[in-house]
Curated annotation (Swiss-Prot):
Compartment(s) of residence: Plastid, Chloroplast
Pathway info: Porphyrin-containing compound metabolism; chlorophyll biosynthesis (light-independent)
InterPro entries named in the record: ChlB/BchB/BchZ, LI-POR_suB-like_C, Nase/OxRdtase_comp1, P-CP_red_C, Protochl_reductB, Protochlorophyllide_Rdtase
Protein species of origin: Chara vulgaris (Common stonewort)
Enzyme Commission identifier(s): 1.3.7.7
Protein name: Light-independent protochlorophyllide reductase subunit B
GO MF term list: 4 iron, 4 sulfur cluster binding; ATP binding; metal ion binding; oxidoreductase activity, acting on iron-sulfur proteins as donors; oxidoreductase activity, acting on the CH-CH group of donors, iron-sulfur protein as acceptor
UniProt binding sites for [4Fe-4S] cluster: D36
UniProt enzyme class: oxidoreductase
Listed cofactors: [4Fe-4S] cluster
GO biological process, one term: photosynthesis, dark reaction
Binding site for substrate: G429, M430
Keyword vocabulary terms for this entry: 4Fe-4S, ATP-binding, Chlorophyll biosynthesis, Chloroplast, Iron, Iron-sulfur, Metal-binding, Nucleotide-binding, Oxidoreductase, Photosynthesis, Plastid
Length: 508
């Protein structure tokens, strides 16, 4: 545990609650003190849904600490069973309530006797895993529970579908553009003649999990959540899975060829090459755009990419391979998947950063001074302070990245959206010059951009006037170099003379 005002991945119980609230008719009981129960508010604020968040907090208060939690937890489970009549009640502690070291499995066993619903304790170590790892583990636990239950009852559906079919595993509530990506994947599979067997967990019922073995293969759109479930199904039922994400023109084609290979081994050979060619050359605009003069203007520009493993890795490859943009640094906060990430990006970027500390990311951005950043909401904040444009490509995000319109990141339409995002994130070449030349009406003041919240430097009036004369595209860099020089030499006020002294010092 650590104290931080910004976390890229939340605590483990958030991942478990995301799984529970993604399924239909599943209720979560969160055994937690006040302060840990913000999930309901967060989901209600961010997700564009009309239903209530199915999470109840069983509050740990002074009475619980005096008498123990069993009575209260069991009462909450049985009460929700009678009120909501859910198919499953999922009990989870938080990292705070885990300190009490209570036997929650015993509470679950007792509540199961009095409840008509299935009751499960989330099998997650709250001190060792983060939100994404916990969600991955909880989904696998729920799937395993219902597969084993169906097997005992003799109603497990092991008969394969007549036509090629797939399960899509890993579409979640509060996911980054998950609903849009799901629609795009469904459309892609429909074009390829592949039936959708089940989509889990978003919008599905736990009672349908017994149908998972019907599918020919499993498709994992994001490796952060869903991979454990796919590996379990592969081990139990020899079901192949695809974890090659269709993000960008090149990797979408690779993913389709992988589907072709799996389907062809199970029935007569299929050929999707003509579909790939048609989509790449005539339907998708991204391939054409990458060869246009507009995109060529971006060639060689420096960018930084940071986010979850899936989005950061594939975004790095899109920028480097498809658009000719130099990725100065690619990074992820998924430290548990660092080996895979390095393997994916090391040949497409200058350096790799694996960290969950936002200050390290901020310092790296300030040091490299890229033309654009592609990251999370935090990198967007950093970019604003350093006057560097930022395109958001990964969770964690705020409300503006839960759009009402259709904005997928996967498939051929996703490639179009990414091309737009990339181009619009870079400052257009003549924009700053035109503002400088014709901007007599422009009242924008040049302000100090720094990652430090307590700047100890002031700019004199003549210093600011001199700074305004410098073209916008290099102004930020000169300003930071001047401030660095001033700090190193103990100067508190920056004048024109200090600016020239800093320039001379830099040139020597």
């Amino acid at each position: 545990m650590k104290l931080a005002y910004w976390m890229y991945a939340g605590p483990a119980h958030i991942g478990t609650l995301r799984v529970a609230s993604s399924f239909q008719n599943v209720h979560a009981i969160m055994h937690a003190p006040l302060g840990d129960d913000y999930f309901n508010v967060m989901r209600s604020m961010l997700e564009r849904e009309r239903d209530f968040t199915p999470v109840t907090a069983s509050i740990v208060d002074r009475h619980v600490l005096a008498r123990g939690s069993q009575e209260k937890v069991v009462e909450n489970i049985t009460r929700k069973d009678k009120e909501e009549k859910p198919d499953l009640i999922l009990l989870t502690p938080t990292c705070t309530s885990s300190i009490l070291q209570e036997d929650l499995q015993n509470f679950v066993d007792r509540a199961s006797i009095e409840s008509n619903s299935d009751v499960i304790l989330a099998d997650v170590n709250h001190y060792r895993v983060n939100e994404l790892q916990a969600a991955d583990r909880t989904l696998e636990q729920v799937v395993r529970y219902y597969i084993q239950k169906a097997n005992k009852q003799g109603n497990l559906n092991l008969t394969k579908s007549k036509t090629p079919s797939a399960n899509i595993i890993g579409i979640f509530t509060l996911g980054f553009h998950h609903q849009h990506d799901c629609r795009e994947i469904r459309r892609l599979f429909q074009d390829l003649g592949i039936e959708i067997n089940e989509i889990i967990p978003e919008g599905n019922s736990v009672n349908n999990l017994k149908n998972l073995p019907r599918a020919w293969f499993n498709f994992i759109p994001y490796r952060e959540i869903g991979l454990m479930t796919a590996k379990y199904l592969e081990k139990e039922f020899q079901m192949p899975y695809i974890a090659n994400i269709p993000m960008g023109i090149v990797d979408t084609a690779t993913c389709i060829r992988e589907i072709q290979k799996i389907v062809s081994t199970l029935q007569k050979p299929m050929d999707f090459e003509s579909y790939i060619d048609k989509q790449t050359r005539f339907v998708s605009q991204a391939a054409w755009f990458s060869r246009s003069i507009d995109c060529q203007n971006l060639t060689g520009k420096k960018a930084i990419v940071f986010g979850d493993g899936t989005h950061a890795a594939y975004m790095t490859k899109i920028l480097a391979r498809e658009m000719g943009i130099r990725v100065a640094c690619a990074g992820t906060y998924c430290k548990h998947d660092a080996h895979w990430f390095r393997e994916e990006v090391q040949e497409y970027c200058d350096e790799v950063l694996i960290t969950d500390d936002h200050t390290e990311v901020g310092n790296m951005i300030a040091r490299i001074e890229p033309a654009a950043i592609f990251g999370t909401q935090m990198e967007r904040h950093i970019g604003k302070r350093l006057d560097i444009p930022c395109g958001v490509i990964s969770a964690p995000v705020h409300i503006q990245n839960f759009p009402l319109g259709y904005r997928p990141f996967l498939g051929y339409e996703g490639a179009n959206q990414i091309a737009d995002l990339v181009y619009n994130s870079f400052t257009l070449g003549m924009e700053d010059h035109l503002l400088e030349i014709f901007g007599g009406h422009d009242t924008k003041e040049v302000i100090t951009k720094s990652l430090s919240t307590n700047s100890d430097l002031t700019w004199s009036a003549d210093g600011l006037n001199e700074l305004k004369k410098i073209p916008g595209f290099v102004r930020g860099k000169i300003k930071r170099n001047t401030e660095k020089f001033a700090r190193e030499n103990g100067i508190n006020e920056i004048t024109v003379e200090v600016m020239y002294a800093a320039k001379e010092a830099l040139n020597t």
